[in-house]
UniProtKB/Swiss-Prot annotation:
Annotated site location: Important for substrate specificity: S192
Entry-linked Pfam families: HTS
Enzyme class name: transferase
Pathway info: Amino-acid biosynthesis; L-methionine biosynthesis via de novo pathway; O-acetyl-L-homoserine from L-homoserine: step 1/1
The protein, known as: Homoserine O-acetyltransferase
Native source species: Brucella melitensis biotype 1 (strain ATCC 23456 / CCUG 17765 / NCTC 10094 / 16M)
Length: 306
């Protein structure tokens, strides 16, 4: 089934060209089914790129999805045109009386700051608390995952000696988890971060389950049943060229920046990278949506009440 997004969103033409089924708003209202309402709180600098990445993964599932783009209320995006934000994004304070089957919160370029120094941290804490009463399933990515386990479980983040950048092997630890249905025993996904949270800091009484980790880069995916959340510490949603784009940006200001590990063939940045994580990205999002669909109430107003 297709994903329902605004007709004029730049992602529409990109996804249609890739063969992703995109449903126009006028067509969606003619289908006599309730679509899954999923919100995307997009904290990444390039909003258009990230919204396209997430919409691509949501749109590949067999259920109709209605995507709502959300921004922090008072934070001004500096790398995305103001007219795009005005046309397609809702401030969180304007949607926090609504209910969502699913809610995705992205990474953010603030991970080297203490959480309390992030300008929108107070609102971020309110968002996390709001998900417990207004959202059925939440997926936190990279910085948002670190922020969520800090908020809910008091888990600190630690600076890494150098940026972890590349495509790293991961181990599936709980293949019986519905979120890992179809996963290989090991697989590779992109990592791009300066900080980490540690398995040794998981509180014994937290209910957190480590689903995926890496001997090189540590925690990858945590299941948080008590908060109906998944915490993905890496960037499974990245495009083929995302790490390359970051690398070429970084060397403009830091010429000694290292080439992403296991990414360019032969570690030669002049050669085009290959995507080795696409299938697992689709599996994760598909499994997450399936679990959401199986358990969310048909009457969306009952979310948070049952």
């Amino acid at each position: 089934m297709p994903i329902k997004i605004p007709d004029d969103l730049p992602a529409t033409s990109v996804l249609e060209a890739e063969g992703v089924m995109v449903m126009r708003e006028a067509d969606a209202v003619r289908q006599d089914i309730r679509p899954l309402r999923i919100g995307l709180l997009n904290l990444m600098p390039n909003k258009v790129t990230t919204e396209t990445q997430i919409a691509r993964l949501l749109g590949a599932t067999p259920l109709q999805v209605e995507l709502t783009l959300v921004r922090m209320t008072n934070h001004v995006a500096r790398h995305t045109p103001a007219d795009h934000m005005l046309s397609f994004y809702c401030p969180w304070e304007e949607v926090n009386d609504q209910r969502f089957d699913g809610f995705v919160i992205t990474g953010a370029p603030v991970e080297r700051l203490p959480f309390e120094e992030v300008t929108y941290w107070d609102e971020m804490r309110r968002v996390f608390d709001w998900t417990q009463s207004h959202v059925h399933r939440t997926l936190n990515i990279c910085w948002a995952a670190q922020a969520a386990v800090y908020h809910f479980h008091g888990m600190k983040k630690y600076d890494l000696p150098a940026k972890a950048s590349g495509v790293f092997r991961q181990r599936s630890l709980v293949l019986a988890s519905p979120y890992l249905r179809g996963f290989s025993d090991d697989f590779a996904i992109p990592v791009s971060r300066w900080t980490e949270v540690r398995k040794s800091d998981i509180p014994a009484d937290s209910g957190l389950k480590v689903l995926v980790d890496s001997t090189e880069t540590g925690l990858c995916l945590l299941d948080d049943p008590r908060h109906r959340s998944l915490h993905m510490f890496n960037h499974v949603e990245y495009d083929t060229t995302s790490l390359a784009d970051e690398y070429f940006r970084d060397i403009q200001v830091q010429p000694e920046a290292k080439v992403p590990v296991n990414y360019f063939p032969g570690d030669d940045a002049k050669r085009p990278p290959e995507n080795r994580w696409r299938s697992h990205a689709h599996l994760l999002f598909g499994n997450w949506i399936n679990e959401m669909y199986q358990s969310t109430p048909y009457d969306i107003e009952r979310i948070g009440k049952v």
